[in-house]
């Protein structure tokens, strides 16, 4: 089982503004050569219109050799957050970039 928490900041080349990314997630992998990714967040809009994105995700991989991406939240305004979810056993979500 893998548990991680990371906080980082990136620069958005389109708006020349700095956006913070705070990610909290846990991944559990069962099987050979499996990869589980936790959550990741961020985005140009972010929540509250401040460029801050927070992602909470849980990645579970129960089949050997497959990938599951955690859930994503970001790229939306305070009233319209955008959520994306990867499927179990080989989801192709936009999170984790692995």
From Swiss-Prot:
GO biological process terms, alphabetically, are: sorocarp development
InterPro entries associated with the record: HssA/B-like_chaperone, HssA/B-related
- From start to end residue, where is composition biased (Gly residues)? 84-98
Provide the residue span(s) of the region labelled Disordered.
1-26, 68-98
Q: Which family does the record assign?
A: Belongs to the hssA/B family.
Name of the featured protein: HssA/B-like protein 50
């Amino acid at each position: 089982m893998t548990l991680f928490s990371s906080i980082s900041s990136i620069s958005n080349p389109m708006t020349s503004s700095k956006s913070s990314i705070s990610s909290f997630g846990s991944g559990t992998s069962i099987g050979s050569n499996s990869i589980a990714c936790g959550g990741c967040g961020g985005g140009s809009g972010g929540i509250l219109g401040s460029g801050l994105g927070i992602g909470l995700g849980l990645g579970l991989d129960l089949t050997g050799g497959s990938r599951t991406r955690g859930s994503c939240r970001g790229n939306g305004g305070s009233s319209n957050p955008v959520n994306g979810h990867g499927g179990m056993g080989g989801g192709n979500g936009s999170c984790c970039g692995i």
